[in-house]
From Swiss-Prot:
This is Glycogenin-1. The modification N-acetylthreonine is found at residue 2. One of its GO terms (cellular component) is nucleus. Changing residue 308 to A: No loss of interaction with GYS2. It holds the Pfam family Glyco_transf_8. Self-glycosylated by the transfer of glucose residues from UDP-glucose to itself, forming an alpha-1,4-glycan of around 10 residues attached to Tyr-195. Phosphorylated. Glycogenin participates in the glycogen biosynthetic process along with glycogen synthase and glycogen branching enzyme. It catalyzes the formation of a short alpha (1,4)-glucosyl chain covalently attached via a glucose 1-O-tyrosyl linkage to internal tyrosine residues and these chains act as primers for the elongation reaction catalyzed by glycogen synthase. Keywords: Acetylation, Cytoplasm, Glycogen biosynthesis, Glycoprotein, Manganese, Metal-binding, Nucleus, Phosphoprotein, Transferase. Divalent metal ions. Required for self-glucosylation. Manganese is the most effective. The record marks 86 as: Important for catalytic activity. The gene is Gyg1. Pathway: Glycan biosynthesis; glycogen biosynthesis. Residues 284-316 are annotated as: Interaction with GYS1.
């Protein structure tokens, strides 16, 4: 169907790798809808050419250069830059209905049935289920809605500093108005929630249709061993309690995306890259100049509490399972 589309967004070359894997997984599961990727000016020309081989439409979104009120909103609230870029998906009025998917999602089976849903359909957020998670949602492009969202962003901002807070404020009736707009969790399975509710995952995880790699560490940040076809990761990392999803992401990347990157000169020698015992030595070649994450400054207990309440616990560091267990043990002794 040419009037319906899956839409994603990439704001740099690193997330473009995620978008390419997402697009490849949609194709692998034989979607009949068009595929669109919105890109910011930070995406390189060479990477944009790779995106054009996977997606039907590659659309540059430069909020600073836009002629609409998005530019004025950005001047007023510069912290919402990426959010305003994502909101541009509502301006794609050449399509009657779309499904937006973040670039850190992976499709596990055909999900074209999502187009039977109405705006705004989304799955609950694992951190606060009365809010929906904006990583996967069904929507209807509309210039009127787009302008209203821009106005809301300008006047009120976002309670979480990102698109999810803004969209939950705009579609505030989602929690109680119409249960048919609540997508089953299997359409947006959070990799972190697997760890937090393992029994449910064991019972229902086999039905997962989309996995969402939430958290600071994305699939492309791990190292991968092509000989064992598995990621090299810390067994205590809560986001990899079930690394088969990470392995599946990397399998899709090495099979479908890596050859495209090589063809366009973004990876010089894929064969020697894959012959390495580990990819850690070549990871910089695939990170396109990504700098390693800077060490996080220490925060007060009050700041840490606020981050927990906002669903931003540092599962990879201070709030890891081992650290929490160690703290509890000191109180229980």
């Amino acid at each position: 169907m040419t009037d319906q589309a899956f839409v994603t967004l990439t704001t740099n070359d690193a997330y473009a790798k995620g978008a390419l894997v997402l697009g490849s997984s949609l194709k692998q599961h034989r979607t009949t809808r068009r595929m669109v990727v919105l890109t910011s000016p930070q995406v390189s020309d060479s990477m944009r050419k790779v995106l054009e081989t996977v997606f039907d439409d590659v659309i540059m979104v430069d909020v600073l250069d836009s002629g609409d009120s998005a530019h004025l909103t950005l001047m007023k609230r510069p912290e919402l830059g990426i959010t305003l870029t994502k909101l541009h998906c509502w301006s794609l009025t050449q399509y009657s209905k779309c499904v937006f998917m973040d670039a850190d999602t992976l499709v596990l089976s055909n999900i074209d049935d999502l187009f039977e849903r109405e705006e705004l359909s989304a799955a609950p957020d694992p951190g606060w289920p009365d809010c929906f998670n904006s990583g996967v949602f069904v929507y209807q492009p509309s210039i009127e809605t787009y302008n209203q969202l821009l106005h809301l962003a300008s006047e009120q901002g976002s309670f979480d500093g990102g698109d999810q807070g803004l969209l939950n404020t705009y579609f505030s009736g989602w929690a109680t108005t119409d249960i048919t707009k609540h997508l089953p969790f299997v359409y947006n399975l959070s990799s972190i929630s697997i760890y937090s509710y393992l029994p449910a995952f064991k019972a229902f995880g086999k039905n997962a249709k989309v996995v969402h790699f939430l958290g600071r560490t994305k699939p492309w940040n791990y190292t991968y061993n092509p000989q064992t076809k598995s990621v090299n990761c810390d067994s205590q990392d809560p986001t990899v309690s079930h690394p088969e999803f990470l392995n599946l992401w990397w399998d899709t990347f090495t099979t479908n995306v890596l050859p495209l990157l090589q063809h366009h000169g973004l990876v010089k020698d894929a064969s020697s890259y894959l012959m390495m015992e580990h990819v850690s030595g070549a990871l910089s070649d695939l990170s396109f100049g990504e700098a390693p994450a800077a060490p996080q400054p220490s925060m007060s207990s009050e700041e840490r509490k606020e981050r927990w309440e906002q669903g931003q616990a540092d599962y990879m560091g201070a709030d890891s399972f081992d650290n929490i267990k160690r703290k509890l043990d000191t109180y229980l002794q």
